[in-house]
């Protein structure tokens, strides 16, 4: 069975160096004046890719020659004991892309030797010598060189296959790890709200003791879930530095689904912001109150229709409010406001949702990177815990909805220079124009 090389295969520097050394050996020991090592090219009928070509004492870059095309039957099939043909065999014409022409081939002074290992023919060794006839001892030496080149080519292909397989598996592993990190981060907001509501319910409870015990159980289980979540996040951040060993299954069984695929599949629809915002604001007002922060909402335009995705918008607003509350000190303020904007250059109508706070602000040098994964900037040096995922998730989801997200800091909401504040403005396409 003739082997072929994938178009993705790239011969290593080590293989090229080995071929060059073997070619030099042929030049010096057997007085060969032209020699070429060619590899089978997948998807090219009877085409062979030049790996190393030598003309006289000069090693020519393989790109200087084109494909070598061999008519049917010009290369004898390998025998069972892998011995070379007993007589020289012909070679077809060599096409080229440089000024260096191969020498004219005399039928009795050329050899085309198949590079065979097992049932795989991976290429050819093409040799021309203008002086002298080929003898038995020389043929044995050529056979040994052809065998060693065949083994080297197969091992190099195998190494390249494993490298490609490792890269694909590593890509899959990195995506899965990123996906889990996003899911864990998105779980934090509803879990925090659940725990806050449970504590508020417990404070206001005036019923029987049995029902109170049920509420206390909810609080305890919420705290337990939060501990498990933190533990899982910690283990994720310490993930293994290397991907587990590869299995023997083909690379084609690995299907990498990068986050970019979600851009094409996220369904968008027209809906009113009033269907999404009120419950989110209610939950975060309770969370803010527990931390002595005032959360206000100016949402007279709550019935504004946008073109977006409900679940994605919920995650975006949750993350922005969570950040606003987290980075605002006690006694601070978080404001939510809605507006309609028209961009004259494009003629498009946008609904803008601005979330402003009187928090610690974002330095100018951080504002360009704040939406990158795992980037926390100056906040990473503070005492407030975070993963640097929230705003990256926001940017990803907003992009998938065809919207925009901008940041302004300082925002002029606070007069305290130590708390310049930040405003994140979410731009959503108005549903009226779709």
Curated annotation (Swiss-Prot):
Protein name: Sensor histidine kinase Hik2
Alphabetical UniProt keywords: 3Fe-4S, Cytoplasm, Iron, Iron-sulfur, Kinase, Metal-binding, Phosphoprotein, Transferase, Two-component regulatory system
The protein's required cofactors: [3Fe-4S] cluster
Database matches in PANTHER family: SENSOR HISTIDINE KINASE RCSC, TWO-COMPONENT HISTIDINE KINASE
Lineage: Bacteria, Bacillati, Cyanobacteriota, Cyanophyceae, Synechococcales
Impact reported for residue 386 to A: Loss of autophosphorylation
GO molecular function: 3 iron, 4 sulfur cluster binding; metal ion binding; phosphorelay sensor kinase activity
Phosphohistidine modification, residue list: 185
EC class (word): transferase
